[in-house]
A protein has these predicted regions:
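Mobile "lid/hinge" segments at catalytic clefts and subdomain interfaces of large enzymes
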Residues: 137-232, 236-319, 345-352, 607-628, ...
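Flexible, glycine/charged-enriched surface loops at secondary-structure junctions
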Residues: 16-22, 68, 125-129, 203-223, ...
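Terminal amphipathic helices with adjacent charged low-complexity linkers/tails
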Residues: 256, 261-263, 294-412, 447, ...
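A glycine-rich phosphate-binding loop feature that marks nucleotide/adenosyl-phosphate handling sites
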Residues: 26, 73-76, 131-138, 222-225, ...
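Ferredoxin-type iron-sulfur electron-transfer modules and their immediate structural context
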Residues: 414, 488-494, 500-647, 659, ...
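N-terminal flexible segment immediately upstream of the FAD-binding catalytic core
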Residues: 1-56, 70-101, 249, 253-267, ...
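Iron-sulfur cluster-binding electron-transfer modules in prokaryotic oxidoreductases
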Residues: 528, 535, 665-1003
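N-terminal glycine-rich flavin-associated loop
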Residues: 9, 33-65, 83-129, 145-197, ...
């Protein structure tokens, strides 16, 4: 059956979008849940027609199939052991409605990106899950994911306008299009009749209809969404809204149109501390009753004074070292808190409260009402609202930091589980206390409870081991007791936000009752009569399915002792590259495979993502350590070489969106180092290069000169053809963007510039303003490309700019022999990297007169490396240096000509991207910061050896360049600029060139 399915599938799709190998099925089969199933086939789909035909093939061969977008769901709804269809990064189209009150979205666009699109219009995307920075629209809608503000009034179900879906027979239905509806009426009359019959049946049962309305008055995503059956008359509206919360069990969502809401201009927050959890919940109930004016409904779907109230229990506060909690502990131990014994801190509970106003006056009125409401409760300290984003931003950072903080402190090898329940708001004070006690009674003493108290919705985090049957049984018993408390005690929701998945599938009927469950089964049968869509999710008749297929999290335990340490070469050995790399890899054991990293992993979608690399490495090490299945271990290790190692840009941007700040690039560096330990010849080549840098630079200049002559002689077309053929044979790829050689700077350069520009200068006069300039070995070797619009290479431009601003340039001694060490670090020779860094450090220390003068490096990746190991000097790349030292010494004359800038990954990591943008805007009134372009993927030399990585990283750039009619771009890394030019067809240069042509000396 599988072989025939694959045979038919390969007639439909190219092989490079069908994965059946051990490595990619394992990688793509990994999601954020604590379940693991490995798909037999992973399919990367690019369009509706493809999806339609794939679904028909699955029907033909009776192959169960699961759809997936970002894979950030938590309940096991995006994993399968059959066919996995990925609709992610190629499904990102959108269309804003005429009045900006709606937006049409494909499923692969990230939620936070939607808010970026809407921001200029003062609108927001209503659903706001905590994963919005990584979760995609398809998953947000199909799981009915919500968060801190949207509640039940602005979730996907309430905000959906229409949907475009693909049914199990391959039919494409657009519920917003009358022609599509008409065609569907003709082709699927029985389908519509069954929907209408189920609607009427449910409504005729007043008890059931009433129960459905009551259940959805609080957050509830347990089971299929029954609300459409009582909320909408039109069968097409019922079909569309049934998709919300269906978790891929009914159809494929290819497009959705959602309402947008106004974003309030005025906001204020307060962290309110209560002495008991019960009283904090009573305050929430009281605040929930406070109504705002009707004008609020023009901005929000609900007119309440308080817009959100997030509860944080004492363990949550402890996990983030909340300063008020720390003071409370001192007061308790000092006997200052009445009726509380020393050492008993569990009473303190915080409610993070937010209110918003259309006008500032309205905001102040709301704050006064909230303060009046809080006055009836006993607080630990007085509540203080702040309108300062910098202050309340810290409050929300505390709230957002709970999950990573708890997850980051869990014992290695355990899973971090986030459970998700909701109670009716009036039951909150009593139910919350009981939930806290229940969790403690089962031995989860480090668990914390936090969440959306305003919606009666709590998350509790458990550090859970699945290493033995006893631990699994403990978890199962606890979950059954939670179910009993929620369902029998308060008729609440066993899943409020995170989806039913496999985790809560055995409890759906228990929560809803027989009649509602039968209605869900009927709805499922109408859409998916053969039960092929996401089998085992929502509907699962194995009562123990929630404790099966549990994901192992084996320890990443490498031979760290074999990593050579070159830290002793450095002025400060504690900044050793080996030590930092090992620490980062050990931190990777905290990875919970949530997938938040993937939005910033540029190889995600081409080969593997950061999350997948960790998951695969865990499997390899586990198999090798246990001796289980050595053939599979060997296969995974072999396949990992290209997909995991060679196509990892190792840029570290994954850490910027990782809750645990894990840098998977360092894992790649370690793997390369361990591989290099087994390659004596490779190490000898590295040693030779380190000891003969001057000769190698000279040799490279000769190579560049020969390549330039060949380019001129053969022409770009023939030269490109020849070089692409050689690249397929393993040679680095030459492109038309390749630079000419760069000659070394001479003293006469400055003199010649002064003569040309008629700048007053007296021989022998030295400026008090000095800068040590290390161009980097790249900029010492590589000049401009053939098509560059300037005649001076970067080194000359820097000298000229410094003279214009009155700065004297100091070059470090022996510069031709110097390198920052980045090349060796990226190749996995960490000790040599530190040795080269130390040589440069000593030269810069001397040239800067022991740190007296700032140091400028012309290459941002090199500076990033230098900053990691050289802490005693002030180090800058061009943009930050110019904004810090030169801006006030120059007159800027901005051009109206459009330009593009590329923010390199190292620029982002150093936090100087804002300087790059600000500087560009001083020089041009028309600056393009391309959307959807992060790391370019050139990654040192990867753009030469694996050009597909560079092409993929920049796949969204050229259309934007052409649309905006841009003729030149700027950055701050020569190697990145080569790749940018090769993939856009326009020259890219260092931003120093732009500053030079846009400025004159200050008058």
């Amino acid at each position: 059956m599988l072989d025939q399915f694959l045979s038919d599938l390969k007639q439909l799709l190219p092989n490079d979008r069908i994965y059946t190998d051990e490595l990619r099925t394992l990688g793509w089969g990994t999601d954020a849940s604590f379940y693991r199933q490995i798909p037999k086939v992973v399919i990367r789909s690019d369009g509706e027609e493809e999806i339609s035909k794939i679904i028909q093939l699955c029907q033909k061969h009776k192959m169960p199939l699961t759809f997936r977008a970002a894979g950030t769901s938590l309940s096991g709804q995006s994993c399968t052991d059959s066919v996995l269809i990925v609709a992610g990064k190629h499904w990102e189209k959108y269309e804003i409605g005429k009045n900006q009150d709606t937006i049409k979205l494909q499923p692969g666009i990230v939620g936070a990106r939607v808010n970026e699109i809407l921001k200029p219009y003062g609108r927001v995307f209503p659903p706001d899950p905590a994963s919005i920075g990584s979760a995609m629209v398809g998953g947000i809608v199909i799981n009915n994911a919500s968060g801190m503000n949207c509640g039940v009034h602005a979730n996907s179900d309430r905000m959906m306008v229409s949907a475009r879906i693909i049914l199990t027979d391959g039919t494409i239905l657009d519920t917003s299009n009358e022609e599509s509806r008409r065609a569907f009426r003709q082709s699927h009359p029985e389908f519509l009749e069954k929907i209408e019959a189920l609607r009427d049946k449910v409504r005729a049962n007043e008890k059931l209809a009433s129960r459905i309305r009551t259940k959805y008055s609080i957050k509830n995503v347990t089971g299929l969404n029954l609300r459409p059956l009582v909320a909408y008359d039109d069968p097409f509206d019922i079909i569309a809204h049934s998709m919300v919360g269906s978790e891929g069990t009914l159809a494929f969502l290819s497009e959705v149109t959602m309402k947008t809401l106004h974003d309030y201009k005025y906001k204020a927050s307060a962290m309110v501390y209560f002495l008991t959890m019960k009283e904090s919940c009573e305050a929430v109930v009281a605040m929930k009753k406070m109504k705002a004016g009707e004008d609020d409904l023009t901005y929000s779907a609900e007119n309440l004074v308080v817009k959100s109230a997030e509860m944080l229990d004492y363990m949550s506060l402890a996990s983030v070292d909340d300063p008020v909690y720390l003071q409370y502990k001192k007061d308790v131990d000092a006997g200052k808190i009445p009726d509380v014994k020393p050492g008993d801190y569990k009473g303190l509970t915080a409610i993070l409260t937010e209110t918003k106003g259309i006008t500032h006056e309205q905001l102040l009125e709301k704050i006064a009402k909230i303060q009046d409401c809080l006055s009836q409760f006993k607080l630990y300290i007085p509540a203080e609202f702040t309108e300062d984003p910098a202050v309340y931003g810290k409050y929300w950072a505390i709230r957002s930091g709970i999950f990573p903080s708890v997850g980051g402190t869990r014992p290695i090898g355990t899973s971090c589980l986030i459970e998700d329940v909701a109670f009716p708001i009036e039951s909150l004070p009593e139910a919350t206390v009981k939930l806290q006690k229940l969790i403690a009674d089962h031995g989860y003493n480090d668990a914390c409870i936090y969440g959306h108290a305003f919606e009666g919705n709590y998350h509790f985090i458990l550090n859970q081991s699945f290493a033995d049957e006893h631990e699994v049984a403990r978890y199962a018993e606890m979950m059954r007791d939670v179910a009993k408390l929620v369902v029998e005690g308060y008729d609440g929701s066993l899943k409020a936000e995170h989806g039913t998945g496999r985790n809560m599938a055995p409890f759906v009927q228990y929560e809803w009752g027989d009649e509602a469950y039968e209605a869900m089964k009927e709805l499922k049968a109408i859409f998916d009569p053969d039960n092929l869509l996401n089998r085992g999710v929502i509907f699962n008749y194995d009562p123990d399915c929630f404790i099966k297929d549990l994901k192992p999290l084996p320890v990443l335990d490498y031979d760290f002792a074999s990593v050579p340490d070159g830290g002793h070469y450095l002025m400060e050995p504690e900044h050793s590259t080996a030590k930092e790399t090992i620490e980062q890899v050990k931190r990777a054991n905290k990875c919970i495979e949530c997938g938040f990293c993937e939005v910033n992993c540029m190889s995600c979608g081409l080969t593997l993502s950061s999350r997948m690399r960790i998951a695969v490495q865990r499997e390899i090490l586990y198999l090798e350590k246990t001796g289980q299945n050595p053939e599979r271990a060997a296969t995974l290790r072999k396949q990992y070489k290209y997909y995991g190692d060679q196509t990892c840009a190792a840029d570290g941007l994954c850490s910027t969106s990782c809750p645990m700040k894990i840098n998977t690039g360092e894992l790649t560096h370690l793997i390369r180092q361990l591989d290099m330990n087994k390659n004596p010849m490779g190490y000898k080549v590295g040693e030779f290069a380190a000891n003969h840098m001057a000769g190698i630079k000279s040799g490279l200049r000769v190579v560049l000169d020969v390549a330039h002559v060949a380019h001129v002689t053969l022409g770009p077309t023939l030269m490109t053809t020849v070089c692409r053929t050689m690249n397929k044979m393993g040679m680095p790829l030459w492109t038309t963007a390749m630079p000419k050689k760069k000659r070394q700077p001479k003293k006469s350069d400055l003199t010649q510039f002064i003569i040309e520009k008629s700048i007053p200068h007296h021989e022998g006069q030295h400026s008090d303003l000095k800068v040590v300039y290390f161009p980097s070995c790249i900029n010492q070797t590589m000049g401009l490309s053939k098509e560059a619009p300037f005649k001076h290479a970067l080194v000359d431009e820097v000298i000229q700019l410094m003279a214009k601003a009155g700065y004297e340039v100091i070059f470090p001694e022996g510069m031709e022999r110097m390198c920052c060490g980045q090349i060796w670090e990226s190749k996995g020779m960490l000790d040599i990297a530190d040795r080269k860094s130390a040589e440069l450090e000593a030269a810069l220390w001397k040239a800067s007169e022991q740190g007296k003068y700032p140091v400028l490096c012309g290459q941002s990746p090199c500076l990033h490396r230098m900053k990691k190991v050289m802490k005693k000097m002030k180090l800058y790349e061009p943009a930050e240096f110019i904004m810090t030292y030169l801006k006030d010494r120059l007159d800027f004359h901005p051009t109206d000509k459009p330009i593009a800038i590329h923010i390199t990954c190292s620029t982002r990591q150093m936090g100087v991207d804002k300087d790059m943008i600000a500087l560009a805007k001083l020089c041009s009134n028309n600056v393009l910061i391309p959307e959807g372009v992060g790391c370019c993927g050139f990654a040192g030399d990867r753009g030469f050896t694996f050009p597909e990585l560079n092409r993929y990283g920049l796949r969204k750039l050229k259309p934007q360049i052409e649309k905006n009619k841009i003729e030149v771009g700027y950055s701050n890394s020569r190697t990145c600029e080569i790749g940018l030019e090769a993939n856009t067809g326009i020259p890219y240069l260092n931003i120093v060139h732009l500053v030079n042509i846009s400025t004159t000396a200050k008058k």
